[in-house]
């Protein structure tokens, strides 16, 4: 199906689409399109559609239909009738939300199923597209330790390969592991650590609605200069439950040398690397009083040129994972020999996971 804005008719990206009463879901792509692959024995009767700044929608489905479903979402016209006074300390709200992570998030070992995609663009042309179905084993959020969280690639495929004529091969290191490393709530080393908070200043922005629930929106940016590049962005926190529901952050690009260190793994001799952007989007979803990881996207933009050449070339590398299913209280862990390593390159290994029936089962 496709999801569009009811007022301006534009397609909506990153809209949550889930089967009502289940853990099965996905998000829309850049064209507003989505697809849910569901077993015949589990034919859904209703879909839940939600997006930041829009009214939640529930769609009833016929028994069988092959028609393309179009869903129209209505923007929230500011539903705050009362005047909101930002009397609370934003740093204090963030600290309270951190303290409530063990209560608000899963207290069991869960096994997530995720759909992963990484793309490489040279200018506007796609030169590489790879996809995978992942298992992500997560321990409880009570101790916020990711050392025992692992990712296993179940199957993969390469839709578009980089050509020999491309003068530069661009690859992502450890890409499928973003379901572990970029789970900002679980991985306190990413941002949400009390000591790390001292490096930032926080201030309130206008409140927003997500899933028909009011959110604190708190901006943050660096207030100190360190040896490494810091982040800036927005934290969305459920006002009632004090759970993190959405995190938008980008790497500070003021010092290009620090930014390069954070982004670049290795490059050919004689290539000049110019970082432009490193941004992250992480969303979480409330299900029956607990909040779970839902979607992660990592976008890197940079320019490259070779010494003695006049013109540079722009590249955009995007990695994303959407959680499509979740099993709670799973005791099984992914064996180390089956886990995808942080220093492995999925593009190079995708043929090992090739499955002609990629969308089957």
How should each PLM-predicted stretch be described?
Residues 1-12:
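Structural motif
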Residues 15-19, 32, 47, 85:
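Hydrophobic beta-strand segments
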Residues 19, 46-59:
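A short, solvent-exposed loop/turn motif at the edges and junctions
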Residues 23-33:
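Short, acidic Ser/Thr/Gly-rich low-complexity loop/linker segments typical of extracellular
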Residues 26, 55-68:
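Structured interaction patches on ligand/partner-binding surfaces of diverse proteins
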Residues 34-36, 67-69:
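Short strand-edge motifs at loop-to-beta-strand transitions and within beta-strands
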Residues 70-200, 211-214, 260-264, 268-361:
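Surface-exposed, low-complexity/disordered segments
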Residues 185-239, 243-251, 282-286, 291:
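Extended beta-strand-rich segments in extracellular/periplasmic secretory proteins, especially
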